[in-house]
Amino acid sequence: MNKVASVILSVLVLICLSCTEKREMTLAQYRNYIEAKGGGFCKTVTAGPLIYTVQYRPPLYIAAAEHKWQFNDSTEMKTRTMALGGIVWFNVRIGTVSGATNPLKSDVSGVAEYNDRLNYWLTQAANHFTLYYGDLELKPQGYVFENSYGLISEDVVVIGFRLPDTTPVRPLRLEYEDQLYNTGIIKAEISMDVLQELDHIQVKI
């Protein structure tokens, strides 16, 4: 084997090792990593007077949140995480650009309009969310609107979609066609490169 071929082979071996090497994190570090603003798992879209923050919630993230970010052991963590496979979940936070007013109350003309807005989020909005997964168009399997009752300046939609795969093997593009504030179609994509990063993270208990 000549020197050039030997160097190329060495570089390829190093690349393979770096691809398979696990990045260790504590649960707190993992939470910060997933929630990082501007990171690959949290997308912010500004549309007119509103801000939509789309947070992808991997199974481990959900399992840890259920256990208040503290597991008894790794078996408990793995068991619950595996049970959550096959459905992808997002939190969609809806706030105003000013941050001074809750979207349900922003420029509302009165109680009747407020109730119409609330009814829309409770009973209709789920029909206007679509997850594009490769060539598939998926509609929600789970939907909850968490009403803050105007106590804070944002409300939250929790929405889930069942995949044909246990874990995503294609990019995830969430779209919401706004029928309430006329802000158009809101899009947020989690790329395959970002999703594959999860395979190289090892959380320590």
Please report, for each region that a protein language model flagged, where it lies by residue:
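Sec-dependent bacterial lipoprotein signal peptides
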Residues: 1-19
